[in-house]
Amino acid sequence: MNRLVIVDCEAPYGCASPATGDMTEFGAVHYETRASFHGKDCSRETMQFFDAWVRSVTPGRAIFVSDNNGYDWQWINFYFDKYGISNPFGHSSRRIGDFYAGLKSHFFDQSSWKQMRVTKHDHNPVNDAMGNAEALHKIFARKNVK
């Protein structure tokens, strides 16, 4: 589990993708240590620091985990690509809700896991990523996931 990094991205309301605007900030939490990273913008320097941070907290290729990976991963991948930085997550990601639905054998139960968050979901991306990491810890413990 030491390769898991939980990520949350924020963008202005109505901004659905990098084609229509810019990410305003993002947060990441290392699953095992709960070390965090706060990207306060989407500049080249921030993405370089994020790349270095991810590589420092994970052995081998990091695994991108998110509440909504279709949304969050597109932003992170876009800015890594924009600045010519190799994405430390590669071209894949994992969604907590889909994993949880599979564990419960209930295809449509993709959000009840959110009740397991401890840190309040307040759209501060570090807090949101931390809450998701906390919930994932509980899911793994309850289901004896290795």
Question: Which residues make up each language-model segment?
Answer:
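A conditional alpha-helix N-cap/helix-loop micro-motif detector
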Residues: K40-M47
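Metal-dependent phosphoesterase core characteristic of DEDDh/y 3'-5' exonuclease domains
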Residues: N2-L4, G21-T24, H30-H38, D51-K146
